[in-house]
Curated annotation (Swiss-Prot):
Keywords: Chromosome, Cytoplasm, Nonsense-mediated mRNA decay, Nucleus, Telomere. Gene3D superfamilies: Tetratricopeptide repeat domain (1.25.40.10). This is Nonsense-mediated mRNA decay factor EBS1. It comes from Saccharomyces cerevisiae (strain ATCC 204508 / S288c) (Baker's yeast). GO terms for cellular component: chromosome, telomeric region; cytoplasm; P-body; telomerase holoenzyme complex. Plays a role in nonsense-mediated mRNA decay (NMD). Recruits UPF1 to cytoplasmic mRNA decay bodies (P-bodies). Negative regulator of gene expression. Inhibits translation most likely through effects on eIF-4E (CDC33). Involved in telomere maintenance. Belongs to the EST1 family. PANTHER family: NONSENSE-MEDIATED MRNA DECAY FACTOR EBS1-RELATED, SMG-7 SUPPRESSOR WITH MORPHOLOGICAL EFFECT ON GENITALIA PROTEIN 7.
Length: 884
């Protein structure tokens, strides 16, 4: 049934009426004592919204078999779900947040015992509200599942996880809600994933608020948010192209101090088909805006890790891999925010970049197995960071190396150095011994597919000596160990019956053209039974392969793509059919010989010192000529110190045979001898040195010398899919990332200003004492405003909000955020409070705000202070009341 134009026009009117009613309820004081008013309002609203959703779906059923997908309107259903969260549930959660903060703040301000009674009252009402929200979204899912047979649109794993199979047969045959079946080619099929994704996303966010509100302490761990992360995981499987899911997951990891995986999720949130503006702002607050509390705290955390590393004896491996990497990444991605203006080779906090680099790569090579996921996340950040740099450009037309700027080439140098260490220190050393660790070869698959999908990256990789060497050595090692009797390098693209975990990790990300392309199996999998489950890595048990079998498939894909990437390299690495391995030019020989010769010379010097130390003492400091001659003759002719004819002589003794070495041996300088064997064959030695020891300020190659199109044949390996993900709107957002401020809520659409009653400047009497608590406290600079459906949520600002368990003196020094709050209508963000600057980045008071020790020394090593205002708030805005 198609709704009339009047019905369509009534929807915005109904929305405005609902917002006006909720505005009146929250403005009153009744909610503190009586929950019945809100409960009745929610029952009415949920009934209306449920009916509107079902009506909208029914109105589209007639179009479900239409050939023109553009004629199918799913915006009305999405707008209803968005309205339910943004204009109804979210403001109420924010109201409970302010109530909780008032209770905790009053406790700290008056130095009274914890007000468990008031907190219990608040928590009881909040839990009732949460259950109402949970039931609403679950009922939407259940109703749609009962009314329509959508088994062809959703994986069975998701149906089982949501326990939908329990209600599968509850619909009567003669019921008006008879089951209707449609296939995956129906336009309506595009609506179901969107509807389920919205519901799962909002359920996960509601659980996150529940976790934040029900704890009397602001200390949280990942385990506290398990339910939320489970829903976000399901939402990403249903609709991987939506960046909001990763933004919300990143907010949780930000709240719990897991900065590496938080940035990882923010990068994913920016690289999807539907980028999240919240991810852009949070990424900017962490990595770009050095005036934000998050960026300052990250600098302090890196310093704490450095102090802990210096103290010893235990090396904080996870902290080094996580925080040192972020420091290096920031110093290359946004040098002006991270590097010292006068000393560009060190961070703002004084730590030298070379130390961070050495410690990071040394830890990677020695402690990778226990931290493989962190290294994997860093790889995604590294790859995504390059494309984020391109999106910051005013023009998005860069196609070749000649179009790149110096900072972008420097970033590629950093990225490929990190990749080369992964290939050399992790993959080559451990792939054969750890088949159960899928991340080892999974990283190589992502690296190869990223290079394959991006022509300018391919151009750079083929001239990057360190990367070409590392990839060739890895392929040689795989071929040499021959993981199976039939294993070989072929042009045949392998096939699978289901996707692997790394496929899901980058599914929907633009830098790999939205899926990995080293297997030719997508169409084949779609024709199989349980195809949707296979595409989320959950095949039937009969088709599930062992870890070793999966490793063989990954190896075949890695070898095939790698051999194509190495075909047109400019580093002289060539495949030898006779030797069945890659051989290296003299430049590689020069590099390896110098290293080996220096090592041999050092060992020889140490051996000579040891011989002198162990030399037997002589009687009275003398030795007979006969004994001396005997010792000289018995010494080896291969010694680096040549045998002399007699004591004091500088002439070597005559050799016993004519089997002698070149004259270089006479001087004992083995390095020179080895260098004589080298033929440079016209290679540029300067270029070799540049690639042997690249620095941050240098590109690995000169772009002007590496962009000869005739040297690259991309047709054999480039993906046929063109990159269309650099939308101008997103590029514009990235251009201003330096000016972005932290924000933690997903903005589905711009909210129109609410029509109707506004809050008046009144306050519940129970909170009136708070007005004068900090009347003269300073406020941070104003932030760009985000319009909310209710005025009391439109108060925004940026600054540090200390944890509630901080010391009273420290708390009061930072309590500007709670001064003169009006919790029913807080209008305390005036111009007179927007003039003070943020506190010093490394002030002692700021460091003391950290809650938990990273290690044993409580006084020195402190955990990241994810303040209450923080960039972890959910789903809308950057309010000063966003206490989480």
């Amino acid at each position: 049934m198609e709704p009339s134009n009047t019905q369509k026009e009534d929807l915005p009117t109904a929305f405005n009426g609902i917002k006006s009613q909720l505005n009146s309820i929250l403005k009153s004081n009744q909610l503190f004592q009586d929950y019945a008013l809100l409960n009745g309002f929610l029952a009415f609203v949920h009934s209306k919204l449920n009916a509107a959703i079902l009506t909208s779906i029914e109105s589209q059923c007639g179009k479900s078999f239409a050939a023109d997908l553009d004629s199918f309107d799913q915006s009305s259903i999405s707008s209803i779900l968005d309205f339910s969260w943004e204009s109804v549930h979210y403001p109420i959660f924010k109201w409970f947040q302010m109530w909780r903060n008032y209770i905790l703040f009053e406790k700290e301000n008056k130095k009274q015992q914890t007000k468990f009674i008031d907190f219990r009252k608040m928590n009881s009402k909040m839990l009732k509200f949460f259950k109402t929200v949970q039931n609403f979204y679950v009922n939407v899912i259940n109703t749609v599942y009962k009314k329509y047979d959508i088994s062809v649109l959703l994986p069975k794993r998701i149906i089982q996880d949501l326990k939908l199979s329990d209600i599968e047969n509850t619909t009567n045959v003669g019921d008006i809600l008879a089951v209707k079946t449609f296939n995956s080619s129906s336009p309506l099929a595009h609506l179901i994933p969107t509807l389920f994704h919205r519901c799962l996303l909002f359920l996960g966010t509601a659980y996150r608020y529940k976790t934040l509100l029900e704890e009397i302490s602001n200390k949280y761990s990942i385990s506290n948010f398990k339910k939320s992360l489970d829903f976000f995981r399901l939402a990403s499987l249903v609709l991987p192209s939506a960046g909001e899911t990763y933004s919300q997951a990143g907010a949780i990891f930000l709240q719990t101090g897991n900065l590496g995986i938080a940035v990882f999720n923010f990068v994913k949130g920016m690289m999807t088909k539907m980028p999240s503006p919240v991810s852009i702002k949070n990424f900017g607050a962490l990595m770009v805006d050095n005036k934000s509390s998050l960026n300052r705290s990250l600098h302090t955390t890196i310093m704490n890790t450095y102090l802990q590393e210096s103290k010893g004896p235990r090396t904080p491996a996870k902290e080094i891999l996580e925080f040192y990497f972020l420091g290096l990444f920031g110093s290359v991605w946004s040098p002006t925010s991270w590097r010292d203006d006068t000393k560009p080779n060190q961070l703002n906090n004084g730590i030298k970049l070379r130390h961070l680099e050495n410690a990071l790569y040394e830890t990677m090579s020695a402690r990778y197995l226990n931290n493989i996921k962190t290294i994997f996340h860093n790889l995604i950040i590294t790859i995504g960071g390059f494309h984020l740099l391109l999106k910051r450009r005013s023009d998005v037309s860069a196609k070749t190396l000649k179009d790149l700027r110096s900072n972008e080439l420097d970033y590629l140098n950093f990225a490929f150095k990190y990749i080369a260490h992964i290939l050399n220190d992790i993959v080559k050393e451990s792939w054969s011994e750890n088949p159960e660790v899928s991340e080892i070869l999974g990283m190589v698959r992502i690296i190869n597919c990223w290079i394959k999908a991006n022509p300018m990256v391919l151009q750079y990789s083929q001239s990057n000596l360190e990367f070409v060497n590392a990839l060739a050595y890895l392929i040689n090692d795989i071929v040499k160990k021959k993981p199976s009797p039939s294993f070989s390098i072929t042009e045949h693209i392998p096939k699978r019956t289901y996707w692997f975990e790394e496929d899901l990790m980058v599914k929907g990300l633009s830098f790999v053209n939205f899926q990995l392309s080293d297997f030719d199996d997508y169409e084949k999998i779609l024709e199989m039974d349980h195809s949707l489950d296979r595409l989320i890595g959950n095949p039937p048990l009969c088709d599930k392969l062992s870890a070793s079998s999966e490793m063989l498939l990954r190896l075949q894909a890695v070898v095939n793509i790698s051999s194509q990437l190495l075909q047109n390299n400019n580093c002289g690495v060539e495949w030898s059919d006779n030797k069945s391995r890659y051989i290296f030019n003299k430049k590689i020989g020069f590099k390896e010989t110098v290293k080996n010769s220096m090592k041999t010379s050092k060992q020889s010097n140490e051996k000579a010192k040891l011989q002198r130390k162990n030399k037997p003492s002589t009687t009275n400091g003398s030795i007979s000529m006969a004994d001396l001659e005997r010792q000289m003759r018995s010494s080896s002719l291969d010694s680096f110190s040549p045998t002399m004819g007699y004591s004091g002589s500088s002439v070597p003794m005559a050799p016993d045979t004519f089997n002698v070495k070149p004259s270089g041996t006479i001087t004992g300088n083995k390095v020179n001898v080895e260098l004589l064997k080298i033929e440079l064959s016209g290679q540029n030695a300067d270029g070799a040195i540049t690639n042997i020891s690249p620095g941050y300020s240098n590109a690995a190659i000169s772009s002007s010398n590496s962009t000869d199109e005739s040297s690259f044949d991309l047709n054999n390996i480039l993906s046929s899919m063109q990159q269309k993900h650099a939308e101008k709107s997103f590029a514009k957002s990235m251009q201003g990332v330096n000016e972005q401020i932290p924000a933690n809520d997903v903005c589905h659409q711009a909210q129109r200003p609410m029509q109707g009653g506004l809050y008046s400047s009144q306050q519940p009497s129970s909170m009136s004492s708070l007005n004068s608590a900090y009347q003269n406290a300073s406020m941070p600079p104003s932030a760009s405003m985000v319009s909310y459906p209710y005025p009391f949520l439109n108060q925004q600002g940026q600054g540090v909000f200390p944890p509630y368990n901080a010391q009273n003196l420290q708390w009061q020094s930072e309590a500007y955020s709670l001064k003169s709050m009006n919790f029913a209508n807080p209008t305390w963000l005036g111009d007179q409070y927007q003039t003070s600057a943020p506190s010093s980045a490394y002030a002692q008071a700021q460091r003391q705000m950290f809650q938990q020790p990273m290690q044993q020394d409580v006084g020195k090593y402190m955990q990241f202070p994810f303040d209450a205002q923080s960039n972890t708030d959910s789903m809308r805005g950057n309010s000063r009341n966003n206490m989480f």
